[in-house]
């Protein structure tokens, strides 16, 4: 199977965020291809390598949790947005901001044109990205996350309006990463890129749909080890960005 981490993430999400190995194995058999004779051991190995609770953790992706070793009960590691993540209608995106023609208010409003992208909907979650060409240190980086709370069409005399088809999203549940993820600290393969460089990784319109395992990777890496947020401290960080 090509993407074990993504498949296991999908299985746990469909199971309500948590499942025993005895429940995971049948789903792997259904979704997997060319599993091989040792597929159960491979399943456990992929869970362990992507879980900081385990001695076998790779030290990079941290998307699964095992609260009690030997229990066989695995769950998604959701530092935030658990309710939204478990809603199977929620999709996940990387939204690029900070462009030269900057119409957005980070952590408040995000603007785009539906003629170029019409995938994002209310309730979706996203990771914020600053592109390399406008970054002060000449590296792109991920600096926060949020939820698309509602959509509205801007008035033609507002700063958000430029052309027919423009639409705005109001952002809720903003999270400012205490640990921004810089280009130098990750590799294309961390986001399942097939190239050695970052060329073609992100779309030209600044809105890239990603799988849940990639969203959790970036969210958990950016938020660090904390499981609960100090709302006042997070609000200060978001406004200071």
What are these regions, as identified by a protein language model?
Residues 1-14, 22, 29-89:
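Phospho-regulated, low-complexity intrinsically disordered regions of nuclear gene-regulatory
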Residues 17:
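Flexible coil/turn residues that form the inter-helical turn or adjacent wing/linker of helix-turn-helix
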Residues 33, 130-135, 153:
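Short beta-turn/strand-loop junction motif enriched in small, turn-promoting residues
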Residues 76-88, 99-102, 114, 153-241:
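Contiguous surface segments at macromolecular interaction interfaces
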Residues 91-107:
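Short, basic/aromatic beta-hairpin or loop at an interaction surface
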Residues 108-116:
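Short alpha-helix capping/helix-loop boundary micro-motifs
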Residues 138-152:
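Short beta-strand-centered aromatic/proline hotspots
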């Amino acid at each position: 199977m090509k993407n074990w981490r993504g498949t296991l993430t999908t299985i746990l999400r469909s199971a309500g965020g948590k499942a025993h190995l005895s429940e995971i194995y049948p789903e792997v058999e259904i979704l997997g291809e060319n599993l091989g004779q040792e597929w159960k051991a491979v399943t456990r190995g992929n869970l362990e390598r992507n879980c900081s609770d385990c001695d076998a953790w790779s030290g990079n992706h941290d998307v699964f949790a095992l609260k009690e070793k030997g229990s066989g009960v695995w769950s998604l590691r959701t530092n935030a947005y658990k309710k939204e993540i478990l809603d199977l209608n929620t999709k996940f995106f990387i939204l690029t901001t900070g462009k030269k023609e900057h119409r957005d208010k980070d952590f408040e409003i995000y603007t785009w044109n539906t003629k170029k992208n019409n995938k994002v909907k209310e309730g979706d979650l996203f990771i914020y990205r600053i592109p390399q060409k406008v970054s002060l240190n000449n590296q792109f980086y991920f600096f926060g996350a949020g939820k698309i709370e509602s959509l509205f069409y801007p008035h033609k005399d507002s700063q958000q309006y430029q052309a027919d088809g423009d639409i705005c999203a109001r952002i809720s549940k903003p999270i400012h990463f205490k640990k921004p993820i810089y280009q130098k600290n990750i590799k294309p393969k961390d986001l399942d890129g097939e190239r050695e460089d970052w060329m073609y990784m992100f779309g030209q319109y600044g809105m890239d749909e990603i799988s849940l395992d990639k969203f959790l990777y970036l969210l958990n890496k950016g938020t660090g080890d904390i499981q609960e947020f100090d709302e006042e401290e997070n609000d200060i960080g978001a406004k200071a960005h």
